[in-house]
């Protein structure tokens, strides 16, 4: 019978199709993750890929689930094929789901609540349910072959003053730890997820000494260099099932050393989820290898 409890750490690398097709259902955080750097990493590895992002800024699961139920023409559908991005406004979720035979479809919480599965912290209470369950049902009914992916974005930069950071007492380590906890709760409640993208770990790893707390462009969204590249590296490694370290693609103007740090931050996140890996020179030396 069908395996009902896939290991979220399962490496799907052996069964990948000739062209990997990835659809993210998300917001600006999925744009950060998949729209800029991911294609180049696959291309450098000689792997054909099509990448889609169903985008509404800041969109939480509740709104995605409502849009799925009403099939609202509410999305900007960004699609990268052959290295070129097209943007189609006023797209329905059903249209995007039917557009390709998607290999992977990711979902994520938005509006700053990705550290809350069914959680109360100080004055904030939030639940991803029943929205997450209902969204998964819609996706599975329309895309039976797709592997479901859960994306767990990163914590804000220390000192960020936006309202969403108040849900975490304006404390980066509180936010990071709550994202780790919420993600584990999601995966326990939903064994349907074949993979999870622990972007919070990759970003937090990269924040250790070499790059520092400079991964965002505004305290919240990833910057266009190290931020987006690091998370792109994580997605690449998780999907390919092989290490991103040594991939020849890096953004224009990025040094080889910086690229190696970003790749290593992502690789260590894949190897050690829900943990921060110190990438300082001393720590790497203690581990008897160069980062």
Regions found by a protein language model. Give the residues of each.
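Bacterial Sec-dependent N-terminal signal peptides
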Residues: 1-16
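Conserved beta-strand elements of the Class I
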Residues: 21-23, 105
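Conserved SGNH/GDSL esterase-like catalytic core that processes O-acyl groups on lipids
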Residues: 32-129
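Alpha-helical cap/lid subdomain in secreted, periplasmic
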Residues: 90-224, 237
């Amino acid at each position: 019978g069908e395996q009902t409890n896939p290991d979220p750490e399962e490496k799907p690398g052996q069964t990948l199709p000739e062209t990997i097709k990835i659809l993210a259902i998300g917001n600006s955080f999925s744009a950060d993750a998949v729209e800029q750097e991911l294609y180049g990493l696959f291309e450098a590895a000689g792997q054909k890929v099509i990448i889609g992002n169903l985008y509404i800024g800041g969109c939480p699961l509740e709104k995605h689930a409502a849009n799925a139920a009403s099939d609202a023409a509410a999305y900007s559908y960004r699609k990268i094929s052959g290295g070129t991005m097209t943007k189609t406004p006023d797209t329905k979720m059903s249209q995007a789901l039917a557009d390709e035979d998607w290999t992977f479809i990711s979902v994520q919480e938005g509006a700053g609540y990705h550290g809350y599965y069914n959680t109360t912290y100080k004055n904030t209470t939030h639940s991803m349910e029943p929205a997450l369950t209902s969204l998964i049902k819609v996706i599975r009914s329309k895309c039976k072959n797709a592997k479901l992916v859960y994306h767990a974005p990163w914590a804000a930069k220390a000192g960020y003053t936006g309202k969403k950071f108040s849900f975490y007492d304006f404390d980066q380590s509180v936010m990071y730890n709550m994202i780790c906890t919420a993600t584990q709760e999601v995966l326990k409640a939903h064994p349907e997820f074949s993979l999870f993208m622990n972007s919070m770990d990759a970003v937090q790893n990269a924040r250790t000494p070499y790059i520092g707390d400079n991964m965002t462009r505004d305290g919240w969204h990833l910057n266009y260099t190290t931020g987006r590249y690091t998370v792109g590296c994580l997605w690449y490694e998780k999907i390919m099932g092989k290490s991103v370290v040594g991939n020849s693609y890096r953004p224009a103007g990025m040094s080889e050393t910086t690229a190696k740090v970003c790749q290593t931050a992502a690789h260590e996140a894949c190897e050690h989820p829900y943990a921060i890996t110190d990438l300082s020179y001393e720590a790497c030396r203690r581990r008897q290898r160069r980062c």
